[in-house]
From Swiss-Prot:
Function: One of the primary rRNA binding proteins, it binds directly to 16S rRNA where it nucleates assembly of the head domain of the 30S subunit. Is located at the subunit interface close to the decoding center, probably blocks exit of the E-site tRNA.
CDD domains, per database record: uS7_Bacteria
SUPFAM superfamilies: Ribosomal protein S7
One GO cellular component, as annotated: small ribosomal subunit
Alphabetically ordered keywords of this record: Ribonucleoprotein, Ribosomal protein, RNA-binding, rRNA-binding, tRNA-binding
One MF annotation (Gene Ontology) recorded for this entry: tRNA binding
Protein name from the UniProt record: Small ribosomal subunit protein uS7
Subunit structure: Part of the 30S ribosomal subunit. Contacts proteins S9 and S11.
GO aspect biological process, one term: translation
Presence of the UniProt keyword RNA-binding in the record: yes
Species whose genome carries this gene: Lacticaseibacillus paracasei (strain ATCC 334 / BCRC 17002 / CCUG 31169 / CIP 107868 / KCTC 3260 / NRRL B-441) (Lactobacillus paracasei)
InterPro entries the record matches: Ribosomal_uS7, Ribosomal_uS7_bac/org-type, Ribosomal_uS7_CS, Ribosomal_uS7_dom, Ribosomal_uS7_dom_sf
UniProt-listed Gene3D superfamilies: Ribosomal protein S7 domain
Pfam families: Ribosomal_S7
Length: 156
């Protein structure tokens, strides 16, 4: 942690094809070992597949998927009197977006299709239709928060 105030949050540039900062952030989450070109190729190929299969604009499908994946509540461990409680807290907007992107990439990597662009396209389409592993993760997170609602008064 810096001694002289907080570090300024850097803003990402919108991507050149779709002119969207969200797409740039997805490329950054996809990127492994700094290979941005490879990550952007995978994403744009996945968006082409979405366009072919759904007939809709891929950016709209992706934004719908993000809306369905982003969590509203999560639990955070809080130690009180020698025992740990899972305290439900509201998720900040920037963290919601980050978690949504992280879960889409994580669960698309675990899918069984042959290429990563296929996996990503299918996971985004599933998320847009409110199915898929990323949406299930969000539901599980909300269930955990709901089950621990009794400890909500421990919020800080």
């Amino acid at each position: 942690m810096p001694r002289k105030g907080s570090v300024a949050k850097r803003d990402v540039l919108p991507d050149p094809v779709y002119n969207s900062k969200l797409v740039t952030r997805l490329i950054n989450h996809l990127m492994i070992d700094g290979k941005r070109g490879k990550a952007s190729t995978i994403l744009y190929d996945a968006f082409d597949m979405i366009k072919k299969q759904t007939g809709n604009e891929p950016l709209d499908v992706f934004e719908e998927a993000m809306k369905n994946v982003m969590p509203v509540l999560e639990v955070k461990a809080r130690r009180i009197g020698g025992s740990n409680y899972q305290v439900p807290i509201e998720v900040r907007p920037d963290r919601r977006t980050t978690l949504g992107l992280r879960w889409i990439v994580q669960y698309s990597r675990q899918r069984g299709e042959h290429t990563m662009d296929e996996r990503l396209a299918k996971e985004i389409m599933d998320a847009a239709n409110n199915t898929g592993a990323a949406v299930k993760k969000r539901e599980d997170t909300h269930k955990m928060a709901d089950a621990n609602r009794a400890f909500a008064h421990y919020r800080w």
